[in-house]
Design a protein with these regions (language model features):
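Generic low-polarity alpha-helical segments
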Residues: 1, 178-180, 208, 226-228, ...
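Bacterial N-terminal signal peptides
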Residues: 1-11
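Hydrophobic/aromatic residues in well-formed alpha-helices
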Residues: 1-2, 28, 679
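Prokaryotic Sec-type signal peptides and long signal-anchor helices
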Residues: 10-11, 61, 351, 499, ...
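Low-complexity, intrinsically disordered segments with a bias for serine/threonine
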Residues: 13-15
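Beta-propeller folds
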Residues: 17-475, 479-480
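Serine-hydrolase catalytic core recognition
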Residues: 301-304, 309, 315-317, 452-758
Length: 758
């Protein structure tokens, strides 16, 4: 067993008589290089910074040793240096008393304070540069005798600071950043159980509430939506009554004397926190509670303030996410009314998006006359325009494709710019489109090139910067006008370093789901020295839950894809697919999971492996492993139980096994009090007697959601006499970072090397 990085013997660990096959140093070196993939791909993606006046932008190119900053004119695409590197470095050397590091621009971020003046940070100081004369001044640091409030640097005072607050949907406290008011005077956050404002001028703190307690506490959302009114004089905060919620017990195991921890948690069918929204003035008055009806067993999301601050719009989802109401509330009196509602016979959205995500289905119109609403009511995610009385003004998009987000509403010119997966030949590619705001028009595709596009609209919405890539296609970036016409190419990634290390382009395949008709897309990573005449073991990575799609669709896909790219270079074929029941396709594709959890997913995945193996003789289907995290861990365990003829080894990490343990399942199964049979069907612990092959379980003591279920599964396997490996990390939660993550990756790698023998 692994406890906090210490390897100790355990009666649960499988015998390790079969030692890992030798991995050559050269192959291991390629694997290690791929674990830090980004430096192998140079350039290609441009992140614009807008220059005052709106006629140009700047961007950084190159690494720390040879960085350059470019200016691009929007009208012509003309690119010129933003900075004269020699003059800049000469001025810095004179002011600092030594030459700055590297050969290029020694900083990557600038902030314009005037059209010809910018600020930057270097070696702990804030500098101001005059672009006309290259006069350089170091901004003074406050001295200690200016008082504690001013002893912090101006840069610190002018930046949002982190704060911690309770998250009842995620378990325990979460780290957040303060939100700056639109007038720039205040930063909004939380101290203890109360709302705090920090002055951007002198750093003083003003407590706007003082009655918060552990059972009745205040929080503020600073990441997912805008709490501030347009004038910066008022803001929306939440209050939560958490009495009745279950208390999950844990501990700080690495202290000299173990310290107990307690976390509020909601199991399926259990008590949710009772939340309410309140409007607070910056400096005076009592909080005004918004009257949104009965908010128990609900999720509340602030859609936004109207420009004249006469109303706050709020989306109120029911507990099962089967219905939503849009409320308009008066921030001065709190009085509210329902202006629009929608219901679904299955679910309106997935639980992750409502609880944690920021991909909301609404977009407020800039002039305050209404909002855009995304809905799957016709079977695909499409855009509808509503006024403030809840009347549908126009349907904006239609067709057999999903809209994924709204990029910009240009009311002056009458356009809505949005991202959608509208290419039927490549249904996961994402492109930019536009459609008339008035409705009645056909969507125009504005981006070109296969892959996933990320766009940044210019401030005046007359152009956009478009970066895209695909699994085998390195990043490109171009500047386009708002009608899609290309102005200039800005960058194409160089993969020379990657080729020198060794690279085989990833492949994409299409297979059929277990229903025999639905297309499933696969991304496959191959060894750098791939030889189609050889036979390779296979490792599948999966998530399979209804919350997210995980198949890599970009070139330098982050997260688990980075590990999977590296793993392939040890001599594996690594595949990932999103089966039925996952988001990103049609509503029918997603709805397969509704009330059918555990009945189809592994059939889709195992069927895909069989089809690929029949088509590709280099895949050795006698050596197939699988791994996943969270619900991916749940389904990796199911793979050993439901398809042991395909999968022979599984690394099951921070898994949720018993659906009663987490309210996330309610959206798809209903409440357990009325749907006990569905919860039994979804309970992977009941599959323990059917598990075959080699199993590695991994969990973490601070993961209040899944650690108990991992231990229950392990104990059940012990009772059955099934040998398995168990890794437990002491100072880690549901996600592993830093050395813990690296250690876990290495354990997983050795597990697959040992049992699949590449």
């Amino acid at each position: 067993m692994v406890l906090g990085g210490l390897v100790v013997s355990s009666s649960l660990a499988a015998p390790l008589a079969a030692q890992p096959a030798a991995i050559s140093p050269a192959r291991r070196a390629v694997y290690d290089s791929y674990l830090n993939f980004d430096p192998l791909v140079q350039g290609g993606r441009v992140v614009p910074g807008w220059i005052p006046g709106g006629a140009s932008f700047w961007y950084a190119e190159g690494g720390p040793n040879d960085r350059l900053l470019h200016r691009v004119e929007l009208a012509t695409g003309r690119k010129t240096p933003l900075l004269d590197v020699e003059r800049l470095r000469r001025s810095l050397t004179e002011q600092m008393g030594h030459e700055p590091a590297g050969r290029g621009v020694p900083f990557a971020q600038v902030a314009f304070t005037a059209p010809q003046q910018l600020r930057f940070e270097l070696e702990g100081d804030t500098w101001q540069l005059d672009l006309a004369t290259y006069a350089l001044s170091r901004l003074p640091r406050p001295t200690a005798n200016e008082g504690d409030r001013l002893a912090t640097s101006e840069l610190t005072r002018q930046r949002p600071q982190p704060f911690w607050q309770e998250s009842f949907t995620g378990g325990g406290e979460t780290r957040n950043l303060e939100r700056r008011s639109p007038d720039g005077r205040w930063y909004l956050g939380v101290q203890g159980h109360d709302i705090a404002l920090r002055s951007a001028t002198d750093g003083r703190t003003l407590m706007r509430t003082t009655d918060g307690t552990a059972d009745s506490l205040w929080t503020v959302e600073t990441r997912r939506w805008e709490p501030w009114s347009p004038s910066g004089t008022r803001f929306v905060a939440e209050r939560h009554d958490v009495r009745g919620m279950q208390r999950m017990l844990g501990a700080q195991w690495l202290k000299m004397f173990v310290e107990p921890l307690e976390t509020r948690w909601t199991r399926a069918g259990g008590v949710l926190q009772a939340s309410s929204l309140h409007v607070l003035d910056v400096v005076w008055g009592r909080p005004v509670a918004l009257n949104l009806g009965d908010t128990r067993d609900s999720y509340l999301q602030v859609m936004g303030w109207l420009p004249d601050e006469s109303r706050v719009l709020v989306a109120k989802y029911d507990r099962l996410l089967h219905s939503v109401e849009v409320w308009a509330a008066d921030p001065s009196t709190g009085e509210g009314r329902v202006i629009m509602s929608e219901r679904s016979p299955t679910f309106l959205t997935n639980h992750h998006e409502v609880v944690w995500g920021d991909d909301f289905p609404w977009t407020m119109l800039p002039d305050g006359t209404g909002f855009l609403w995304r809905s799957e009511r016709d079977g695909w995610d499409h855009l509808y325009r509503y006024d403030l009385n809840g009347r549908m003004v126009a349907r904006l998009t239609q067709g057999s494709f999903p809209v994924t987000s709204v990029v910009r509403v240009d009311q002056q010119r009458g356009w809505v710019y949005f991202m959608a997966q509208g290419d039927p030949a490549r249904p996961y590619d994402r492109h930019l489109y536009r459609v008339p705001l008035a409705g009645g028009g056909t969507a125009q595709r504005l981006s070109e090139g296969a892959g996933v596009h990320e766009v940044t609209m210019c401030p005046l919405a007359d152009c956009f910067v478009d970066s895209w890539s695909s699994p085998a296609g390195p990043p490109h970036t171009v500047l386009r006008r708002s009608d899609g016409a290309q102005v200039t190419a800005l960058g194409e990634a160089s993969i020379d370093r990657l080729r020198r290390v060794g690279w085989t382009p990833p492949r994409e395949y299409v297979v059929k789901a277990a229903d025999g008709s639905t297309d499933l897309w696969v991304t496959m990573y191959l060894p750098f020295d791939f030889d189609s005449t050889r036979s390779y073991p296979v490792v599948e990575f999966l998530y399979a839950g209804p919350q997210v799609a995980v198949r890599p669709t970009t070139f330098a896909e982050p997260g688990p894809a980075q590990y999977n790219r590296a793993l392939a270079n040890l001599g594996f074929v690594v595949v990932t697919l999103d089966a039925r029941g996952t988001p990103g396709r049609s509503k029918a594709f997603h709805d397969v999971v509704f009330r059918k959890w555990g009945t189809f997913e592994i059939a889709d995945h195992a069927g895909a492996i069989r089809q690929l193996g029949a088509r590709l003789p280099f895949m050795d289907l006698t050596r197939v492993g699988i791994w996943g995290r969270s619900w991916g861990g749940h389904y990796a365990l199911r793979a050993l139980a439901q398809a042991p003829d395909v999968y022979s080894a599984a690394s099951v990490e921070v898994p949720g096994f018993d659906p009663v343990g987490n309210q996330l399942y309610e959206t798809y199964l209903g409440l357990p009090q009325q749907n006990a049979a569905l919860y039994d069907q979804a309970n992977a612990i009941l599959l323990a007697p059917k598990v075959r092959g080699h199993l590695r379980l991994m969990s973490a003591l601070s993961d209040v959601a899944t650690f108990p279920e991992t231990m229950r599964m392990s104990e059940e396997l012990v009772r059955l006499g099934f040998q398995h490996e168990l890794s437990i990390f002491a100072n880690s939660g549901h996600g592993q970072v830093g050395q813990t993550a690296r250690y876990n990756d290495e354990q997983r790698t050795q597990f697959f090397v040992r049992h699949l023998r590449p």
